[in-house]
């Protein structure tokens, strides 16, 4: 399944982007540690690296740092050139033309194509849209919930404050500071350039194309 997701996504980007080396940004972890094979979003990146010279910018994915701790390790194991990007720097890197495409995994997709993924994904999609570069979300068809009309119906988990107040046992802020720590955010379908599952590619992303890949 993940191999097909990877090949479909890589073929699309290879065909649509200008020839030559590429820089792709990703967020959180969507590789073998989160799925089977080489993963979903990272599976697309790995397959694309077999077609083009590729450099990957992996966002940290605070506060649990899945990008820094997991994705960077997987990219190294795959032999893909990469660098770690500060989360807050990512939109600016996109705006200044240092990124050719953004590729992420996904946690849930509504019937209209709204995508829930690791918090911070929405900001990357906004930046990609403003810069006119592809934002691709990749995942299994089982993550598509046709019973959900739109992303506003997706429940967003609010995680514990201590994940933000401290890191690796070191306090980062004033003890007891109130914290907002949503685990996910929702990217509207209008910002998703393409949605990839093992059943195909939804593009443009709308109710009909999403149903076809669910």
Show which residues each predicted segment covers.
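N-terminal active-site beta-alpha-beta segment that forms phosphate/nucleotide-binding
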Residues: 1-85
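Conserved phosphate- and dinucleotide-binding cores of soluble alpha/beta proteins
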Residues: 53-54, 59-214
